[in-house]
Amino acid sequence: MLLLAFTSVTFAGSETPTGAADQSLSRFETALAEYVHKKDPAYRYDLRQTISGNGFTEYVIELVSQNFLTLADVDRTEWHHWLVVVKPDVIRHKTALVYVGGGSNRDDSPRGARDEFVSIAVTTGSVVAELRMVPNQPLRFAGENERRFEDSLIAYTWDKFYRTGDVRWPARMAMTKSVKAAMDALQEFIPVVSSGHTLADFVVTGASKRGWTTWTIAAVDQRVRAIIPLVIDMLNLVPSFKHHWRAYGFWAPAIDDYVDQNIMAWMGSPEELALHKVVEPYTHRQHLTLPKLIINATGDEFFLPTSSQFYFDKLLGEKHLRYVPNSRHNLSRTDALQTLLAYYHSVLSDRPRPRFEWSFEADGSILVECHETPVVATIWSAVNPTNRDFRVDSIGRSWTAEVVEPVTEGVYRAHVTLPEKGWKAFLVELTYSTPIDVPMKLTTAVRVLPNTLPHDYIAPKWPDEGFIRSKQQ
């Protein structure tokens, strides 16, 4: 039932640097799998609440996934999560959806599942679960007065890894193990409350740093059948962030937590390459051949809309892409959830996904060749007359749509007029019908014309305190 590999234009120069130094880091390649699958005696779960609904039942479970570090390193080692489960009265599938979510450990117990997850469970006849508090936060590390959240927490743990080489430190290790624990708990719990019904596998999704976690759990756990990572448009991190600087001439304020921790100064260093061996999805791509739908935002505060050029073509197996126009990083006020539902339903029902290829042509157009004809093809475009910057924060929600007619059956060519000043970004969106009357929207990558980058990237002087370089001096 799986479609043929979905391909795009090939972009030159998108590989992370390799060589003898990179090969010496091979010992880190299995660290993630070893960490995630190591048995942790802290693992346990407890049903806290059962809520009956019309055609479904909700369960609020307190899950302890692991111990992270020791009390000599951090003020709280046990990672506690709320695992909120929706079970339809009639379960039609052995596949469940796991949404990896955030939140604070200061939050009260959930009153139940979110409406959107109830809707997905009832519509598809499948179990849907939201795993909250990934990462556990806030955490206060030894020697610090302030508690850290989100990117500040992650950046701090990266810095610790760069200086020590200790694979226990990167918070993404524990974040990934959290999802493994959630899947374990679901496979144990569902047969108890559903007359022996079993779960065989999972579709995993999550946004931003939880989108990164979506990639990493798929790389190390074969129970993951497909993934839908949201707004984590930064695989192949080194060339991606060099591109970031060359487009903007500065680091976007959204990544200030990493700048403040001096993470950007490590870019390209042996220590950073070691971290990538551990937790960067791009380095694990040989294990990521499963179906994948990557949903990104054209106006993301963190990532450029042209970032997929550094990874998408090199991903293996079935792959689809959607850039949501006029969207910030949070994907609010968009139909991204409909695309997620349509894709998830296609996985559950073993329906082939649409196949198409695109290329960026020498005349400045995007050429799209479809195996299955879409209901409609649309060109979305936006202009910034002063900067190569398409964040909503910079240009507002200014992307506009225009229907494009086929050149021949299933073939579309998207031409745009160059702006008198500045840069124009554009993409082609293809809309397909589905059996559940929810459209599946997929896109090409984003093209920017003229293809110029106004700023030079100057490589930083790497810190001397790295666990590799300090031994070489």
Predicted regions and their residues:
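Catalytic-loop region of hydrolases
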Residues: 16-92
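Surface beta-strand/loop "capping" patches
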Residues: 342-381, 400-410, 414-415
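Short beta-strand element of the alpha/beta-hydrolase
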Residues: 82, 93-103
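Gly/Ser-rich "nucleophile elbow"/oxyanion-hole loop immediately N-terminal to the catalytic nucleophile
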Residues: 162-208, 223-224
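Hydrolase active-site cap/lid region
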Residues: 216-265, 322-325, 331-338
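Short beta-strand/loop motif that positions the catalytic acidic residue
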Residues: 288, 294-296
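Cap/lid segment of the alpha/beta-hydrolase catalytic domain
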Residues: 102-107, 118, 126-180, 234-247
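Conserved alpha/beta-hydrolase "acid-adjacent" motif
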Residues: 301-307, 332
